[in-house]
Amino acid sequence: EDTENWINDKFSKLPEIAKANIKALKTGYNFGITVEAFHHTYVVEKAALPAGEYTNINGNIGLSWGLIAAAKKANLDLFYGSYPITPASDILHELSKHKNFNVITFQAEDEIAAAAASVGASFTGKLAVTGTSGPGLALKSETISLALSAELPLVIVNVQRGGPSTGLPTKPEQSDLMFALYGRHGESPLPVVAAKSPSHAFYAAYEASRIALKYMTPVILLSDNYVATGSEPWNLPNTCLLYTSPSPRDIG
């Protein structure tokens, strides 16, 4: 029914084309049910989801929206500095679509410059975020330590992929936890938040931002290739119920 509605809407000015497409759709659907080429057939039942308004998201989109929500709650502009790297690049692409929410995106010449620009944005009062994957996190480690010693809020997104070294851009892996916890020189502990699903990526990004702003510290947000590119229906939250993210200007 939803597909038929989409076809009718798509070809509203060409009803004959819409009719032909619906006929082809039903023919293919009925063929799959009646053909005797398969020993077993099954029907995928409709998912038993709680009532609500849903949209389909992947982890990178959910994470991006969580950052935007945190910035709006804190009444801050959002700055995202990044260098393209699979599978984190789509966060830059998604955030660049939302300039109307006072989102500033910056594609730097390398990973170190992206992190340094984000530290500068944090110093000027933005909710500053930099994103990368495993090898990029290694390059950013000195700048992360700088933000820590300067007590500047900064969210570092690490969408993990197969490693070590440059690794395998399209292979899912969750092998950067120890590096996220301890991969900096000197005594430089910081919080680490991890997303477990595409929809949870929204809340993980929001929480990482809240912690960074409240405690004036860098926070590493871990995702991975599977979460980033996997998708699921997401029940849109009531943003009024989200914790308020404090602004640095509110912290004495």
Spell out what each predicted region is.
Residues 2-182, 189, 195:
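Thiamine diphosphate
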Residues 22-36, 190-242:
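Structural signature of the thiamine diphosphate
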Residues 85, 227, 250:
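Short, glycine/acidic-enriched loop or turn micro-motifs at the edges of active sites
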Residues 110-111, 224, 250:
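Acidic active-site catalytic centers that drive phospho-/nucleotidyl reactions
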Residues 125-127, 208, 250:
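Intrinsically disordered, low-complexity serine/threonine-rich segments
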Residues 243-252:
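Single conserved hydrophobic/aromatic residue that forms the stacking wall/gate
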